[in-house]
């Protein structure tokens, strides 16, 4: 295979890796935790990954405490946990 062909193959494999969604086996374990509002009362919207619904869902977060299945943006939740 020529060097141009190898570069093209490497580029395609890299693109595939970037665009392939997170699979359940690659998903961090904390994505399986239930949403936890935490112990404070500075309520704001946050997102958690729902294993039941298989998507990121908004919930009310108290501003402190809670667990790792807590994201400020939908995009952050999806890129970390969503399949």
Curated annotation (Swiss-Prot):
Major localisation: secreted
Signal peptide (residue range): 1-24
SMART domains according to UniProt: KU
GO terms for MF: serine-type endopeptidase inhibitor activity
Summary of the tissues where the protein is detected: Expressed by the venom gland.
Compartment(s) where it occurs, according to its Swiss-Prot or TrEMBL record: Secreted
Domain (BPTI/Kunitz inhibitor) ranges: 31-81
Pfam families assigned to the protein according to its UniProt record, in alphabetical order: Kunitz_BPTI
Disulfide-bond pairs as recorded: 31-81, 40-64, 56-77
Domain of life: Eukaryota
Keyword annotations from UniProtKB, A to Z: Disulfide bond, Protease inhibitor, Secreted, Serine protease inhibitor, Signal
UniProt GO cellular component terms: extracellular space
InterPro entries: Kunitz_BPTI (IPR002223), Kunitz_BPTI_sf (IPR036880), Prtase_inh_Kunz-CS (IPR020901), TFPI/VKTCI-like (IPR050098)
Family (UniProt): Belongs to the venom Kunitz-type family.
Function: Serine protease inhibitor.
Name the record gives this protein: Kunitz-type serine protease inhibitor textilinin-7
Source organism: Pseudonaja textilis textilis (Eastern brown snake)
